[in-house]
Amino acid sequence: MNKRERLAAAYNGQPVDRPPVALWRHFPGDDQDADDLAAAHIHFQRLHDWDFLKVTPASTFMVDDYGVQTAWCGNEEGTRDYVSFPVAQAEELTALAPLDVMTGSYALARRALQQICSAVDPDATVLQTIFSPLSQLKKLAGRRLLPLLRLHPQAVQVALATLTANSLRHIESLTTIGVGGIFYAVQHASAHQMSRAEYAVFGRPFDLQILQALPAGWFNVLHLHGADVYFDDVADYPVQAINWHDRETWPDLTTALTRFPGAVIGGIRQWDTLLRGAPAQIRTEALDAFAQTGGQRFILGTGCVAPITAPAANLRALRQAVETMPSHRPAAHRMQD
């Protein structure tokens, strides 16, 4: 099987020659320049030969042009620290103007993607990271997000509509350069962030506007960030795979397969195992994840980005783990009614 065939078989629940596998990471410093960002991803893909390549621009790339100020301070995830947030008042929410996605930070990301798609194995699906509109607004408002949301809900809705429209224009601009899907990052579908009722109003409608507009044939991944996620609330999203911190929070892989019809991505602890563990632990967790799923609708990975300081031996061990796994065996994972 080639990579695209393997991915399609995995998310459709069909036999695979081996489980697909992928890791992704930030490239701090390199993410400030299109050529450097592209070169880093191209090298990463050629080194490890992942079944798909998730491109990871700076986490604020969708809102940088609104005036977000950040600095690289050494975070092990590779993310930049916030220096200042441009939104603090309701009137600043409604004043957010549409962005020209062919200029500025959006354009930087697109130029990098164009180089990546031209350089990597055409059999490898390239995914662009897209942050949900609510996640984008958090990057603009910081800790002011929830007070604004609760005190000025209409102004928040206006801002979310603007950010959604920006996102859709950016995605449309990617359809001609070889991108094969998106990695859609949701950071607020969690009991630690807001209530289910709040997410139903300020998260889900805007998520669906984006996900329902994606081109047919793309491979799209939903990422649920954090603990105590509202998995069941998003299990009907029109995506081919879901990724979450399966080793740290409910549901486990087995349970998720009964609630979501596509593929599940995970199996390896991001910090305890990939960063601080040894290759033998990687192999043990990978085999356990295979056992949980029977290798069916299963893609080996971690719950989030690979720490930039993770040992190279651990990344190699994760990539090599699938080579010794059999094709999937029938498993009794049935969707719940």
Language-model region placement:
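Active-site loop segments of alpha/beta catalytic cores
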Residues: 1-28, 40, 100-337
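A gly/proline- and charged-residue-enriched helix-loop-helix capping module
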Residues: 77-115
